[in-house]
């Protein structure tokens, strides 16, 4: 389907009978309209050709071989525009055989049939709109009971029989016995309604705006009543209010999409294109057919039987007609969703038939396996591992995957640089893994983004673009900040990598899909690139420190050994009695850590700017140390003040660790970079 902006899209919803017939009908030169499948046959057992008006009819679905009709005549497609496009004898159109992948047919049902998705799936849309119990509607659909039509001021059979109830449970055993087929049909059309036709009438009589108004009034009345004091009654009222909300939302959706509720009852049943339900000949001359073909045959057999009962048979009891309508309803239910809330239908080998729902739903369905998860060229797959040294917009590709994905680009580069005279020599250089191959691969990857996808792709952040870099190993390296968008972790998850080929795809990847341009959740607007899992553990370990305060050196001999026999430049830091290091800048502390003179979690004193905010006004020093020159140090829980003889503050030291310093510097650099970028943008 193509919308007004020329975008290809797929829309799933209910359609009108007119739209179904428009999809299938074709007008032949003699004025005959074809498109309706009336016979349950597939191929003739002698000629091995599709049966006319059957499930594989060439008049309805197109020729099996391009440009060849059922008679065997051949015509070049599009060569002679003046000649008729249809064969005059068999009525087959001269067209490409690929039309059998999308040309549909239809079955004209002899009675209305309820779509099982809207009736039996929970929540039931039909039950919600009609505000009736699902069990009652199922009994009505499967002809277990009926309801009387309101006919005012007219004598009716039901009045004569004294049956004035709205729902008549006893019709199945009494009323049909009085009529033949035509008589019962007349009686039913005039006085009672049953089957899917009754559902269709009630849906057609609905005014959705009145449904919304009545539901809203009832919801407000229930809300004004308040609590009854009975827990069971309160729960019942709560469930009723939830139901009314769902009913209003459903009615609004029908109004917004301009869909008529009676479309949930089928009069025409679409028939899938033959290529989507093939019959394949295997070794030994045996045929292997899709289960959907057998289910379609079952529907056509029962529908044709019902048609014959309604048209030709004049003495058949009305009860038999009702039973046949029930069989048609069950056959269509099995075709659309086999076994929904019941026992599934099985073949002779006790194997469950795969219905239309089974074909499209689930991990192995048409959408997830064939359309979304199918194998494509220029793609690869591997396990993901954390890449902490990567930028947010980069990903690490293993050499083995990268050379396969970009092989055609590398071959073109080798030929352009006159390093290979033809494709064969270029491929041999790639197989031998010559150094020049990796250089050209690096150049190609610098200007070509890749797409990473993690199944299931439930929202748009399931596919993001990255700038690839070569890494060793066989796993894809990923920045941990992008894991939340993919719903990925590093416990064995796999991701697929794709190469956008066209210029439009590359432009879309760069402008819309790069990971650093998708920092907010499209659903709620919250930041989605937040530290999770490995990053949180790393930040915890980095800033864990030692929680024993200033007494750590005095009572932990293991830490004291870290400083024994260490000679340190007095310009960088000096020792106290407990050998607790003093640093005059964060650079000195990080340098000492890189030289392995201190460990990551070792408490240290870092000189801080004279900021009075770090000093608690009511805090009492834990210890005061006096120097020989009259200066002294006031030691608190997390900071230290050096005062002069006149009690003036000379300097302040804060208690920290190398891990805290590293974390603080990373945040500071990030904030400064953001401020610079913001100032440039404004």
UniProtKB/Swiss-Prot annotation:
Binding site for Zn(2+): 69, 71, 87, 90
Single GO term (MF): magnesium ion binding
Keywords, in A-Z order: Chloroplast, DNA-directed RNA polymerase, Magnesium, Metal-binding, Nucleotidyltransferase, Plastid, Transcription, Transferase, Zinc
InterPro entries from the UniProt entry: DNA-dir_RpoC_beta_prime, RNA_pol_asu, RNA_pol_N, RNA_pol_Rpb1_1, RNA_pol_Rpb1_3, RNA_pol_Rpb1_3_sf, RNA_pol_Rpb1_clamp_domain, RNApol_RpoC1
Gene (name only): rpoC1
Subcellular location per the Swiss-Prot or TrEMBL entry: Plastid, Chloroplast
Entry GO CC: chloroplast; DNA-directed RNA polymerase complex; mitochondrion
Location (main, coarse): plastid
Protein name: DNA-directed RNA polymerase subunit beta'
Protein purpose: DNA-dependent RNA polymerase catalyzes the transcription of DNA into RNA using the four ribonucleoside triphosphates as substrates.
Cofactor section: Mg(2+); Zn(2+)
Keyword Plastid (UniProt): yes
Cofactor descriptive note: Binds 1 Mg(2+) ion per subunit. Binds 1 Zn(2+) ion per subunit.
Family, as annotated: Belongs to the RNA polymerase beta' chain family. RpoC1 subfamily.
Subunit (UniProt): In plastids the minimal PEP RNA polymerase catalytic core is composed of four subunits: alpha, beta, beta', and beta''. When a (nuclear-encoded) sigma factor is associated with the core the holoenzyme is formed, which can initiate transcription.
Lineage: Eukaryota, Viridiplantae, Streptophyta, Embryophyta, Tracheophyta
Assigned EC number: 2.7.7.6
Organism: Acorus gramineus (Dwarf sweet flag)
